[in-house]
Structures are given as C-alpha cells and as structure tokens.
C-alpha cells in the first residue's frame, strides 16, 4: 500500500513516484483558495487527469437502481467484510484490475470498514457503503485500473464544493493502493 505524503509545493503533485523522496507515496490535497499560480497548476493537473486519470465535476452521486441491480447480478447479494471476500468479488467486478491491486484495494476497504465499525456503524450501513463504493469504482473509476501501481500514478481531479463522507472513503481507499 502507498503511504500518504505531504507536498511541499503544487508541482510535487505531478511528480512520478520515483521522484517523491525517500518515502514515495501519494498526495491527497484540497485547495481552498484561488490565485494565478493555482489556476496554472490546475490546468496542468486537469490535463494530466484527462490523459491518465479521472475528472469528477460535482459530487459522484448515489448509484441508481440499474447499477445496484447489475452489481447484485454479477456478485450476488452476499457480503462479508473481509479481504478474501472483497478480493474475490473484485475478480469478477473489475477484471482489468491486477491481482495485487485487488488485494490492496480489499485491504484498504477493510481498514475503512473496521474504522466505521469502531465508530458504531452497523453491518447494514457497512454493506451499503460497500455496494456504493463498488458501483463508484466500476462506473466512475474503472479507467484508473490499468494505471494503478505505475511509477506515474493516475490523477484524480475532484471539483466540488464539498466531499461526502462516503466519497472520502473511496478516495482514501484509492490513495492507499
């Protein structure tokens, strides 16, 4: 799993992994101000995300009935919050994802589920979050799968006013891969 590291400046966000210092990792940045420098950086980052990543404008939105139905058709209705179950589900659901990335994703997802349990979330809530994250992964982030684990990681540009707790869970999982 990749570690989350802090950027010393915005241009760090475009560096390949090998140029990110002694402990390479991923960046998770929220910009809350505007300047000509930020505008220029965002244009470069936007182009990088367009070429090799995902651009999300506005919130992701809940999966619709058709998407949930397809998820259930493909994976069944069973759910177990453990890495083996999630890795097996990802084999069917995300065929372009490498086995190593399936394992990393499953471990990161289980870490997030464990954190939710510690906060008092029920199994039903955790199952619903699992279904939501799996739908988002398939319908919004599938394009990232071939690039995960590369020296030049995919970019995610998320343009919105506020990120929901569930969206943060997915972004956190992806940042740990």
Listing of model-derived features with the role each one plays in the protein:
Residues 11-21, 141-150:
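Short boundary motifs at domain starts and secondary-structure transition points
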Residues 1-11, 18-135:
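Conserved N-terminal ligand/cofactor-binding loop architecture of enzyme catalytic domains
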Residues 115-177:
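Active-site and donor-binding regions of nucleotide-sugar-utilizing enzymes
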């Amino acid at each position: 799993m990749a570690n989350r590291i802090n950027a010393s400046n915005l241009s760090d966000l475009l560096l390949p992994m090998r140029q990110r210092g002694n402990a390479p990792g991923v960046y998770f940045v929220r910009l809350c101000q505007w300047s000509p420098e930020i505008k220029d950086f965002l244009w470069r980052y936007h182009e990088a995300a367009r070429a090799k990543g995902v651009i999300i404008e506005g919130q992701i939105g809940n999966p619709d009935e058709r998407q949930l139905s397809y998820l259930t058709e493909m994976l069944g209705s069973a759910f177990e919050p453990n890495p083996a179950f999630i890795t097996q589900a990802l084999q069917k659901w995300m065929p372009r994802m490498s086995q190593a990335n399936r394992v990393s994703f499953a471990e990161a997802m289980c870490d997030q589920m464990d954190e939710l349990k510690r906060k008092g979330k029920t199994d039903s809530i955790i199952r619903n979050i699992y279904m939501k994250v799996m739908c988002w992964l398939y319908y919004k982030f599938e394009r990232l799968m071939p690039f995960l684990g590369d020296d030049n990681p995919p970019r995610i540009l998320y343009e919105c006013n506020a990120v929901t707790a569930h969206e943060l869970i997915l972004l956190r999982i992806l940042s740990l891969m």
